[in-house]
Amino acid sequence: MSDNRRRRREEDDSDSENELPPSSPQQHFRGGMNPVSSPIGSPDMINPEGDDNEVDDVPDIDEVEEQMNEVDLMDDNMYEDYAADHNRDRYDPDQVDDREQQELSLSERRRIDAQLNERDRLLRNVAYIDDEDEEQEGAAQLDEMGLPVQRRRRRRQYEDLENSDDDLLSDMDIDPLREELTLESLSNVKANSYSEWITQPNVSRTIARELKSFLLEYTDETGRSVYGARIRTLGEMNSESLEVNYRHLAESKAILALFLAKCPEEMLKIFDLVAMEATELHYPDYARIHSEIHVRISDFPTIYSLRELRESNLSSLVRVTGVVTRRTGVFPQLKYVKFNCLKCGSILGPFFQDSNEEIRISFCTNCKSKGPFRVNGEKTVYRNYQRVTLQEAPGTVPPGRLPRHREVILLADLVDVSKPGEEVEVTGIYKNNYDGNLNAKNGFPVFATIIEANSIKRREGNTANEGEEGLDVFSWTEEEEREFRKISRDRGIIDKIISSMAPSIYGHRDIKTAVACSLFGGVPKNVNGKHSIRGDINVLLLGDPGTAKSQILKYVEKTAHRAVFATGQGASAVGLTASVRKDPITKEWTLEGGALVLADKGVCLIDEFDKMNDQDRTSIHEAMEQQSISISKAGIVTTLQARCSIIAAANPNGGRYNSTLPLAQNVSLTEPILSRFDILCVVRDLVDEEADERLATFVVDSHVRSHPENDEDREGEELKNNGESAIEQGEDEINEQLNARQRRLQRQRKKEEEISPIPQELLMKYIHYARTKIYPKLHQMDMDKVSRVYADLRRESISTGSFPITVRHLESILRIAESFAKMRLSEFVSSYDLDRAIKVVVDSFVDAQKVSVRRQLRRSFAIYTLGH
């Protein structure tokens, strides 16, 4: 039985050997013995367990062939493979790229990575384009070699892919995703939010392409490339900020402007990369100077006040204005941070450091340990970081409200752009960040809000001409500017402006003249860049109580473009100048500006000036003349600008002014501070029956005019009373009284029409326009006359000894003359302006004298004051 079985197996083996392909070479095996012809019943082939029914499978032909073709690599000649052979150990020069490779820039490296990723994606897509039916059908088919048909089909597809140079290579060079999305298709948002839509790869590439075309192709009316010139200027100055006008982007590509307003953080990242690429077209090696270019957005159309910011503005672009009140030092902030694992020494990162949260490493990717980790100071990238406090400008705070403030973060080259006291305009991203102290204070989760500045500019003069009409009560339009010029051509414009100062206050023409001169101001000068001369006019109002001094100060506060009100008792030296306090977060000393610093390029109003102590008053000496405040406290040595006019009101000693005593004995002010006031107005509450009657009539009429709805009732009541009295009296007498009253009213109305006050809103804009646009020059003036006046004033001052006259008063005459020229919107100071200025200074000097010499001085200086 076993012999028959063995014979049958031998026949099967011979049949399988004959079935080999005829082209197959004859198989040679070690020992000259064919394993197929070996006896099956040999001990090597018998089941070791002795089971006759189970035998080992016959070895596969391929496996046997592989075993027979093996080469012993560990023989005695193995070391000869490593011996040097100079004839063969040479590389083919055609196959070796030994050219020097330049270091790629960050933008070029990202572009190549994106191209390689896209190529790999296309290869994967083409390799698996068969549908399921074809795969199932191919899996069931075998070729004559026994290989699945599907594999051969895929192999052919790879071969076709390599051979289709014209189609595939062109697709790799030109990104097909860029061709799929156009600028119009970007508006069809296919995501839950703008942020998700922008971060999609095809959308971000399309946005980058359109932004690049905008920077390279946008032209002005003359056909000149706007941003090409700015990029060249950026390269010449080695700057890292490129200013982009938002209105230009909105006109050229509106959908991108919408994305920028809604998702500024994502858009600015793309914009910065595009700006770097555009800059490298002009300066290929610019990345060696600055690794990044920051796009600064300007002229954003919507301006918010700090109190108008709400949760709907979070993560969007906002534009706010305010005054910088506090500024921290400059700190290095982590941007891209790398860590060293102290156990295995590997470097982890880089990780992008966001301003909202701190990066924490949980474990090392190399050794899987949980630390400790240390920041790699050499490979970590830092950037400048600074925080400033922005407060609402004094003129924009609603009545009865406290000014709001916000923290603003300045990064990169924006640090130290502004100083405390400067009014700035910030365009940035309104963000929220976690504040543990705020949560503990409120007892429930809330977030603090900050503004991450994108651009910051100091506000200089008017901004309405840039397209912001109607946003500010002090801005003007072109039509209003023509109205200003028309008003300035009036011969009596100076008297009309003086009459328009505090029209609800009767009389005090000298005070109104001084206030008008202070509001318009003179022209600051810088002599050869070495010595600066102030152009602001300081005024001191000294007089009896109840003479409307505080009312005039309040009027100036509402009229001036920028005014800060302070009182003598409530203001200290640091409150007026500057203070140094410790920052609660960084524990460093920071600088905060006082009232004079906040009133920079405006007016500082100080009531109850006599109530200040001498130490506090001496602190403003430097601010009144040099218009700067020097600080040297807590290791901070700096100088702050205080370019403002000071209008102060004070009461005399004892409550009332004594005309029999000189000025120095009526007020407890020292000569150094008195000499710093350009105009001194002494107000006396004298008893004059006629003047008191006119004052009472004016006050009553003011109250009556404030209730216009009662005019008709009052007229009807008067007619009724007149009718009843006509019955009792004769008609002739009544008619005579009515005619006399009518003539008196006509004379009063005619006088009011001759000098009608300018509307307050128009006057505010007129003053601001004159301060920012008009800079009159001293040309063809009678300087000898000024010299004579100064000499006469000095002589009389020494003889009377009541009011000191210094060289500052000589400069005051010129400043006041320039202010009168500004009232006329004139480019030159005329002799008429000079005569008015001399009269103001002389009257100020004479009124400060005691009554015994006042009349004599008026006669002495009549030659300078008559006719004005």
Swiss-Prot record:
Residues 1-65, 87-106, 704-728 are annotated as: Disordered. The modification Phosphoserine is found at residues 14, 16, 23, 164, 170. Residues 493-700 form the MCM domain. A motif (Arginine finger) lies at residues 675-678. It holds the Pfam family MCM_N. GO terms for cellular component: CMG complex; cytoplasm; DNA replication preinitiation complex; MCM complex; nuclear pre-replicative complex; nuclear replication fork; nucleoplasm; nucleus. It catalyses: ATP + H2O = ADP + phosphate + H(+). Residues 49-65 have a biased composition (Acidic residues). It comes from the Eukaryota. Its EC number is 3.6.4.12. Keywords: ATP-binding, Cell cycle, DNA replication, DNA-binding, Helicase, Hydrolase, Metal-binding, Nucleotide-binding, Nucleus, Phosphoprotein, Zinc, Zinc-finger. Changing residue 392 to K: In allele MCM2-1. InterPro entries: MCM (IPR031327), MCM2 (IPR008045), MCM_CS (IPR018525), MCM_dom (IPR001208), MCM_lid (IPR041562), MCM_N (IPR027925), MCM_OB (IPR033762), NA-bd_OB-fold (IPR012340). ATP binds at residues 543-550. GO terms for molecular function: ATP binding; ATP hydrolysis activity; chromatin binding; DNA replication origin binding; helicase activity; zinc ion binding. It is found in: Nucleus. GO terms for biological process: DNA damage response; DNA replication; DNA strand elongation involved in DNA replication; double-strand break repair via break-induced replication; mitotic DNA replication initiation; pre-replicative complex assembly involved in nuclear cell cycle DNA replication; premeiotic DNA replication. Acts as a component of the MCM2-7 complex (MCM complex) which is the putative replicative helicase essential for 'once per cell cycle' DNA replication initiation and elongation in eukaryotic cells. The active ATPase sites in the MCM2-7 ring are formed through the interaction surfaces of two neighboring subunits such that a critical structure of a conserved arginine finger motif is provided in trans relative to the ATP-binding site of the Walker A box of the adjacent subunit. Present with 1690 molecules/cell in log phase SD medium. Early fractionation of eukaryotic MCM proteins yielded a variety of dimeric, trimeric and tetrameric complexes with unclear biological significance. Specifically a MCM467 subcomplex is shown to have in vitro helicase activity which is inhibited by the MCM2 subunit. The MCM2-7 hexamer is the proposed physiological active complex. Component of the MCM2-7 complex. The complex forms a toroidal hexameric ring with the proposed subunit order MCM2-MCM6-MCM4-MCM7-MCM3-MCM5; loaded onto DNA, forms a head-head double hexamer. Belongs to the MCM family. This is DNA replication licensing factor MCM2. It comes from Saccharomyces cerevisiae (strain ATCC 204508 / S288c) (Baker's yeast). The lineage of its organism: Eukaryota, Fungi, Dikarya, Ascomycota, Saccharomycotina.
